Amino acid sequence: MAVPKRKTSPSRRGMRRSADALKQPTYVEDKDSGELRRPHHLDLKTGMYRGRQILKPKTAEV
């Protein structure tokens, strides 16, 4: 069975666990529509990304 040679200090343990925290996602306001969206992601309502039409905008089906 593997046994550690040295005791892990609280500082080293905390540095190891520092990457485990959940971070709140960031949002930016879209220049064209004014809606909030994730940075470097396309706007799902309009289908635009960096001024280009990537996806067809969704139309309301009756």
UniProtKB/Swiss-Prot annotation:
Keyword Ribosomal protein: yes
Source organism, top-level taxon: Bacteria
GO BP terms in the entry: translation
UniProt keyword Ribosomal protein present: yes
Composition bias type Basic and acidic residues, residue spans: 28-44
Pfam families to which the protein is assigned, alphabetical: Ribosomal_L32p
Gene Ontology cellular component terms for the protein in this record: large ribosomal subunit
Chain spans, region Disordered: 1-62
Biased composition (Basic residues): 1-16
Gene Ontology molecular function: structural constituent of ribosome
Stored InterPro entries: Ribosomal_bL32, Ribosomal_bL32_bact, Ribosomal_zn-bd
Keywords: Ribonucleoprotein, Ribosomal protein
NCBIfam families according to UniProt: rpmF_bact
Family: Belongs to the bacterial ribosomal protein bL32 family.
Protein name per its UniProtKB record: Large ribosomal subunit protein bL32
Record organism: Azorhizobium caulinodans (strain ATCC 43989 / DSM 5975 / JCM 20966 / LMG 6465 / NBRC 14845 / NCIMB 13405 / ORS 571)
Lineage of the species this protein comes from: Bacteria, Pseudomonadati, Pseudomonadota, Alphaproteobacteria, Hyphomicrobiales
Gene of this entry: rpmF
